[in-house]
């Protein structure tokens, strides 16, 4: 994946094949299955195949691993949304690609990490929360920039309200949508766009 390779080269996320990357990957699986509090450093070390003490060459404390999982997931999401609309000309397609990008964030490779971000938010310190919120605000600002720039063309009356409705509905899809069902992410993005703009679906959007 080009986005991942670029972020690794820029030092914004860990190489999944590196010791640090393997720790993050295995920890995310354990945190998702057992929860942050119930996962021990020994559990993580065993999953990675290293001694417990070796973890501390890469992370000072267990919470730093949790923060890294969340931080790297948000960075991937930011890069993905920016790439999604790059070169897109029409307002409708820009919004559709943003919706599609967010669905990919929820249901794609970053899905587990984004779920951890929500479920384990209270497990990190206030200072770490502030850093993550700064990253998250970057993501949201991009959304609002696209919506505001295209509000007239898309006949959007309230940009803030639309973003909140989209954010809530897209996030909730994690409870009912399955990738192996009858509707793929492209079709789901078409449905969400039609609902957001109160437009009838085009024939090609029908599964």
Regions found by a protein language model. Give the residues of each.
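N-terminal intrinsically disordered/low-complexity leader segments
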Residues: 1-18, 25, 29, 88, ...
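C-terminal peripheral helix-coil segments that are non-catalytic and often amphipathic
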Residues: 1-7, 104-108, 140-149, 160, ...
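Amphipathic alpha-helical segments used for helix-helix packing
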Residues: 94, 107-127, 144, 175
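Amphipathic alpha-helical packing segments from all-alpha helical-bundle domains
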Residues: 75-78, 116, 126-152, 160-164, ...
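Hydrophobic alpha-helical connector segments
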Residues: 68, 82-112, 162
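Helix-turn-helix
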Residues: 11, 22, 26-64, 68
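Amphipathic alpha-helical interaction segments
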Residues: 22, 93-97, 101, 116, ...
């Amino acid at each position: 994946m080009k986005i991942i390779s670029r972020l690794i080269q820029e030092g914004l996320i860990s190489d999944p094949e590196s010791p640090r990357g393997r720790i993050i990957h295995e920890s995310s699986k354990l945190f998702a299955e057992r929860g942050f509090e119930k996962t021990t450093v020994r559990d993580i070390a065993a999953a990675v195949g290293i001694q417990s003490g070796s973890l501390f060459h890469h992370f000072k404390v267990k919470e730093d691993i949790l923060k890294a999982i969340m931080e790297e997931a948000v960075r991937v999401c930011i890069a993905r949304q920016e790439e999604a609309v790059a070169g897109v000309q029409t307002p409708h397609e820009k919004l559709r690609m943003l919706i599609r990008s967010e669905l990919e964030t929820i249901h794609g490779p970053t899905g587990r990490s984004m779920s951890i971000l929500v479920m384990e938010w209270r497990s990190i310190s206030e200072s770490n929360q502030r850093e993550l919120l700064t990253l998250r605000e970057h993501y949201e600002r991009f959304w609002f920039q696209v919506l505001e720039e295209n509000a007239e063309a898309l006949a959007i009356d309230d940009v803030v309200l639309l973003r909140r409705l989209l954010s809530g509905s897209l996030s909730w899809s994690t409870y009912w949508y399955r990738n192996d069902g009858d509707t793929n992410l492209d079709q789901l993005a078409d449905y969400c766009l039609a609902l957001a703009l109160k437009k009838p679906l085009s024939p090609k959007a029908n599964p």
